């Protein structure tokens, strides 16, 4: 029987760059954009002669990229070897497969027969990403449709993916696939790890918070293996906020010490994988996460300006280089940025508390402010509670404006477009619109989709305004849930909603 797991994409509201270093925190929102992994056997029965095999088959299918890859999995070493003619590889999924199977070996040390049988049947793995992870502007424009969420909604679910055109000068400034910056590799890696661990009986995704086979929650096991797979696939130990969000959902995140993965980086070519994973699972994972979500009646919107995305690793590298060349200025910038990030976090938490304690007043204030530009919000500060709510709203805006200024200063000093001029103009006009609390460039910034937090029902007007500025509002919203077990193949569950969809070539 097939196992289907999914994991969400992310939006890093605050903590861009700073989240790379402890103890700086990042506020990260999980979204309704999800990556799915479907795991089932290639063969329904184990062939009698297969018990003597030293290898088994693994098939990896990515329908959106029209790619199918075949591998042989060594049953002794748990390593994958590609046997496909195509040289297109997916290191994230390959590492996820190897480390999930290594964890399964570790978890079933006393009873390997059932695991061995599952592996001998072969592994048929399909990966699917929500359309929101990818840019479909070109197809929409080619079809002569307006740049609106409604046009996006006409796309068939899990539509074919757009590739960025190569630069005329051969430069590789954009990723191969046109993306929106929602952390597709982290969501994909997490979904594959979770689906395989559930399929192989290591975790139970129907109750993932209980203590599992390794003395910690099943979610923690998924997190550790997904982080390891993702970091080794990237060739570096990142902050991990994107994987943490994919596993646990929306949160306030402080990174783990990179040393916890240094053993895996060194040992990956020499030691058996189950030994490496054993050390990882026993390691001191000191990441910190606290539940966080937007205050009530606030909505996340993302707008794609149509630049095909940015290369995050090269931007991070440039910022690190600047830190080393001008440490004093960099420290001052980061301290100010950390203070502004904390201020915004505090204001949003205060608003959540005010909503809980004074719901009726909060509801009226948000409704009133949703149809006004921010300079007119004070007109509704007629009573102490109203005034307190509006004060927090305005101070949250001020904190975001400070964050943007400091991020721009960092970008200028490091010679990277963290908030490029085109994005600045778009963000300024967005923040001056009715009912918009704040707007910014998520994560590392650049030319990815921008985000806005709106009040009440003001989002519709914002998406119309974006469309008139040639910005495509995505269908992404905040969804606080992390990795989960799905009831079936998402392509079949989407059929009813996709009956009226069209296929854009």
UniProtKB/Swiss-Prot annotation:
NCBIfam families, alphabetized: Pmev_kin_ERG8 (TIGR01219)
Gene that this sequence comes from: PMK
Protein name: Phosphomevalonate kinase, peroxisomal
Gene3D superfamilies: 3.30.230.10, GHMP kinase, C-terminal domain
Residues recorded as bearing N-acetylalanine in the entry: 2
Disulphide-bonded residues: none
Source organism (scientific name): Arabidopsis thaliana (Mouse-ear cress)
Pfam families assigned: GHMP_kinases_C, GHMP_kinases_N
Positions of ATP binding: 177-187
Highest rank taxon of the organism: Eukaryota
């Amino acid at each position: 029987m097939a196992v289907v797991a999914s994991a969400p994409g992310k939006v890093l509201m605050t903590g861009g760059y700073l989240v790379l270093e402890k103890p700086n925190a990042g506020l990260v929102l999980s979204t309704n954009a999800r990556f799915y992994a479907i795991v089932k056997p290639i063969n329904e029965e184990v062939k009698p002669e297969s018990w003597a095999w030293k290898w088994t088959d693994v098939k990896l299918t990515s329908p959106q990229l029209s790619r199918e890859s075949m591998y042989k999995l060594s049953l002794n070493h748990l390593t994958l070897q590609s046997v496909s003619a195509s040289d297109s590889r997916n290191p994230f999924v390959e590492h996820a497969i190897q480390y999930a199977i290594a964890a399964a070996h570790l978890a079933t040390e006393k009873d390997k027969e059932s695991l061995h049988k599952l592996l001998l049947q072969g592994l048929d793995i399909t990966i699917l990403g929500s359309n929101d992870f990818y840019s479909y502007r070109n197809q929409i424009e080619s079809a002569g449709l307006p740049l609106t969420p409604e046009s996006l909604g006409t796309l068939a679910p899990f539509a074919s993916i757009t590739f960025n055109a190569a630069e005329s000068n051969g430069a590789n400034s954009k990723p191969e696939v046109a993306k929106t910056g929602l952390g597709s590799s982290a969501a994909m890696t997490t979904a594959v790890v979770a689906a395989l661990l559930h399929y192989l009986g290591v975790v139970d995704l129907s109750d993932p918070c209980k203590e599992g086979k390794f003395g910690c929650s099943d979610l923690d096991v998924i997190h550790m293996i997904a982080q390891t797979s993702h970091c080794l696939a990237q060739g570096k130990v990142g902050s991990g906020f994107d994987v943490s969000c994919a596993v646990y959902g929306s949160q306030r995140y402080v990174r783990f010490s990179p040393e916890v993965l240094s053993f895996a980086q060194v040992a990956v070519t020499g030691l058996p994988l189950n030994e490496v994973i054993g050390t990882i699972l026993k390691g001191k994972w000191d990441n910190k996460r606290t539940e966080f979500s937007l205050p009530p009646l606030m909505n996340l919107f993302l707008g794609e300006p149509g630049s095909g995305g940015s290369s995050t690793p090269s931007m991070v590298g440039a910022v690190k280089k600047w830190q080393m060349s001008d440490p004093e200025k960099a420290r001052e910038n980061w301290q100010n940025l950390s203070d502004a990030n904390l201020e915004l976090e505090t204001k949003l938490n205060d608003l959540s508390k005010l909503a809980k304690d004074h719901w009726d007043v909060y509801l009226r204030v948000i409704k009133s402010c949703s149809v006004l530009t921010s300079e007119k919000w004070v007109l509704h500060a007629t009573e102490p509670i109203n005034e307190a709510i509006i004060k927090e709203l305005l101070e949250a805006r001020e904190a975001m404006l400070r964050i943007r200024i400091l991020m721009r200063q960092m970008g200028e000093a490091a010679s990277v477009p963290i908030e490029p001029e085109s994005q600045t103009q778009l963000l300024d006009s967005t923040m001056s619109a009715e009912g918009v609390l704040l707007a910014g460039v998520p994560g590392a910034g650049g030319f990815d989709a921008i985000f806005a937090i709106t009040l009440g029902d003001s989002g519709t007007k914002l998406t119309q305004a974006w469309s008139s500025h040639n910005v495509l509002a995505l269908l992404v919203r905040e969804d606080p849930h992390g990795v989960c077990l799905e009831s079936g193949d998402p392509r079949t569950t989407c059929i009813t909603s996709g009956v009226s969809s069209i296929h854009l070539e």
